[in-house]
């Protein structure tokens, strides 16, 4: 297993797929990283690789080029911290989205009269009136 951005990525998979094991890197960003790494390798007159190459077949120079290209993006812990700080900021300024976060309700305008059980949690039963 190769180590990129302190994450062990699977060696037997294609490079494009392996990079998606890192939080914050999807398929399109993975392809972008590979293009940048290949440009860097071409400048240094090293052997380039394709998206279909397996991680286990890459040389140390190629892996280092991928590491350097991936460093420029916000990933893993830094990304988690950024997202949590954004949510905290919304709650502090008491905007509509922040209030929805604080109350544990859907934030993006979904209807909540009958649905949104995942966000609201299990039903809280209310006792009916006794002795009509």
From Swiss-Prot:
<dbReference type="InterPro" id="IPR010979">
    <property type="entry name" value="Ribosomal_uS13-like_H2TH"/>
</dbReference>
<keyword id="KW-0694">RNA-binding</keyword>
<keyword id="KW-0689">Ribosomal protein</keyword>
<dbReference type="GO" id="GO:0019843">
    <property type="term" value="F:rRNA binding"/>
</dbReference>
<dbReference type="GO" id="GO:0003735">
    <property type="term" value="F:structural constituent of ribosome"/>
</dbReference>
<keyword id="KW-0699">rRNA-binding</keyword>
<feature type="compositionally biased region" description="Basic residues">
    <location>
        <begin position="116"/>
        <end position="132"/>
    </location>
</feature>
<dbReference type="Pfam" id="PF00416">
    <property type="entry name" value="Ribosomal_S13"/>
</dbReference>
<dbReference type="GO" id="GO:0006412">
    <property type="term" value="P:translation"/>
</dbReference>
<keyword id="KW-0687">Ribonucleoprotein</keyword>
<dbReference type="GO" id="GO:0005829">
    <property type="term" value="C:cytosol"/>
</dbReference>
<dbReference type="InterPro" id="IPR027437">
    <property type="entry name" value="Rbsml_uS13_C"/>
</dbReference>
<dbReference type="GO" id="GO:0000049">
    <property type="term" value="F:tRNA binding"/>
</dbReference>
<keyword id="KW-0820">tRNA-binding</keyword>
<comment type="similarity">
    <text>Belongs to the universal ribosomal protein uS13 family.</text>
</comment>
<dbReference type="InterPro" id="IPR018269">
    <property type="entry name" value="Ribosomal_uS13_CS"/>
</dbReference>
<feature type="region of interest" description="Disordered">
    <location>
        <begin position="106"/>
        <end position="132"/>
    </location>
</feature>
<dbReference type="GO" id="GO:0015935">
    <property type="term" value="C:small ribosomal subunit"/>
</dbReference>
<comment type="function">
    <text>Located at the top of the head of the 30S subunit, it contacts several helices of the 16S rRNA. In the 70S ribosome it contacts the 23S rRNA (bridge B1a) and protein L5 of the 50S subunit (bridge B1b), connecting the 2 subunits; these bridges are implicated in subunit movement. Contacts the tRNAs in the A and P-sites.</text>
</comment>
<dbReference type="InterPro" id="IPR001892">
    <property type="entry name" value="Ribosomal_uS13"/>
</dbReference>
<comment type="subunit">
    <text>Part of the 30S ribosomal subunit. Forms a loose heterodimer with protein S19. Forms two bridges to the 50S subunit in the 70S ribosome.</text>
</comment>
<dbReference type="InterPro" id="IPR019980">
    <property type="entry name" value="Ribosomal_uS13_bac-type"/>
</dbReference>
<protein>
    <recommendedName>
        <fullName>Small ribosomal subunit protein uS13</fullName>
    </recommendedName>
</protein>
